[in-house]
A protein has these predicted regions:
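Extreme N-terminal tail/first-helix region
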Residues: 1-18
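Charged, gly/pro-rich active-site loop segments
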Residues: 2, 75-131
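Hydrophobic alpha-helical segments typical of transmembrane helices
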Residues: 4-8, 53, 94
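A generic structural signal for nonpolar/aromatic side chains embedded in well-ordered alpha-helices
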Residues: 9-12, 56-57, 98, 121
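Short beta-strand segments
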Residues: 15-49, 57, 63-67, 78
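A short beta-turn/loop motif at secondary-structure boundaries
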Residues: 26-28, 69-73, 111-113
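Short, surface-exposed beta-strand-loop junctions and turns on beta-sheet-rich folds
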Residues: 51-53, 72
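A short, polar/proline- and glycine-enriched secondary-structure boundary/capping micro-motif
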Residues: 54-60, 76, 104
Length: 131
């Protein structure tokens, strides 16, 4: 489903950010830049419990992500999808992994009482202007 010419945006070494668009409970849109990973089938998103992202993803609201090329923001891929999985298990390890991807070190600050949660988003539609 991912266009071959745009696959590089999902690779670890590209370090592309995604812009996650969600619909809040009251129907208003919200967009957040995020770190992400790709397991070949799902986009992996990590957040802390009770944050805006967590509340919207937990409701299984449809999502959209724009992933621009880090070197040319006019080249991008848009992914629309659905949340298929949510777990707190391994949540802190996942944010450490993402910290390593984007900052080169696994050591992510652990905040007292913070619970990390990982979501898997399955793409349902993919659009790209990369040829």
């Amino acid at each position: 489903m991912i266009p071959q010419a745009a696959e590089y945006l999902l690779k670890w070494e590209t370090k592309a950010f995604a812009y996650l668009a969600l619909t809040l409970k009251d129907g208003t849109p919200q967009v957040t830049p995020i770190w992400f990973d790709w397991d070949g089938t799902h986009l992996i998103i990590n957040t802390a419990r009770r944050r805006v992202k967590d509340k919207a993803l937990h409701r299984r609201a449809p999502v959209a992500l724009a992933i621009p090329d880090p070197h040319d923001a006019y080249r991008y891929m848009q992914i629309r999808g659905v949340v298929e999985d949510e777990t707190e298990e391994g949540g802190y390890d996942m944010i450490c992994r993402l910290n390593e991807k984007y900052h080169g070190q696994r050591d992510y600050p652990k905040r007292p009482g913070e619970v990390r949660v990982t979501y898997k988003v399955r793409p349902t539609q993919v659009f790209s202007n990369i040829r």
